[in-house]
């Protein structure tokens, strides 16, 4: 027996020596923007959801988390780019002022990042399936030569909730003013005219003076009425023909201008322009706080951010979100410019040309786009403590628990951590000014953005989202250098458009000269 055991032990040891060591997971370097300096980068290494994604992909991450204010992080990003030594994966706002001059298109032209088409085909089944099932989304993620250059959080914008989660502004009114003049919130252009007239003549602020501003058009408020005339501000798609048009170069624009000029002439709109060049006026806030503005372009957080200060002037003040006015041709309710299908101007994730293991980098990112990966970057993991005790997973994903007494979200370690640390929102618990998104590549799961909001915030976003976005021009943000030059030339006409729009609305130029305006645009 002893001899047998000794022999068996010896054989076992020999087999162990002969067997190859278990392969270690490949490691990729991941460069990401964090929050301000107070947010500890080590959290990226400790969050359970991100650990789970690495486990799913069989890939480890060596993090570089850049923290600080705008100037500080821009300096670090520029220094990294100038060094010529690039991390494997770079997650950043590459296409805006904090990013690379020329955006990801120029990064590709300069040899900094790789094209992803073959990478997606070979190593990213989750992501490839999403693109195949959502061809319209896929188009917006390509450059104008059909290349995929970056990854980004994607909202498919199909369900009402998905639309509402990125719809945070629209038309708003003083609810108490509507009650004071005995009217309901308007739903058509004609009803808007009637309500604005009542605001002007009915002394709804109750100070016995005709000082009301029925519609404060600050921050481009009048542009929100363009979809009611079947056009948008800039490029749009005609839903009936499928052809691309330009809002300010159309006969529908003349009808829009006629209505806006009428409102302006009758004193129903004010604070439209800052100067005679057609520069749009600043926000409606001063007139709002002075108890003078009856309607305006507002954000869904105005109940929290603006109403308390208005109540200091008028304790009876209250706001109400107003739906987009129905199209004048009777085709329904439409709008655009609120939730676009362009993603490149947000945080985008690229794979650099210095990446020695593109397959590992691709597997990691693809795991984030899986259903489980999306849950990980949104909720954490079902079995992680304390999430399991604080969140409901009966629907296959996490859901915040709302305290019935306060109506507030029940705080969890995960929620506080991910919100405080991840740049560009992650959880919108502390990111108060707009609904936001997780910056990591991910798909859908828009429901989390609604779970932490005040009831009126959610209700207004849902109301504004109840409209067709068929006018939306799904242009890809990423353009090659030649295309960028062409767009720049097109943009040169904007000064003329702004100047003439100012003149038409204010009456400085009669609308009988609209055909001349159209001819001049054609020449330009």
Model-derived segments and spans:
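Conserved N-terminal structural module of periplasmic/extracytoplasmic solute-binding proteins
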Residues: 21-191, 229, 234-236, 244-248, ...
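Conserved small-residue motifs centered on glycine
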Residues: 367, 371-502, 508
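Short, solvent-exposed loop/beta-turn-alpha elements that line the ligand-binding surface or hinge
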Residues: 114-133, 176, 184, 234-251, ...
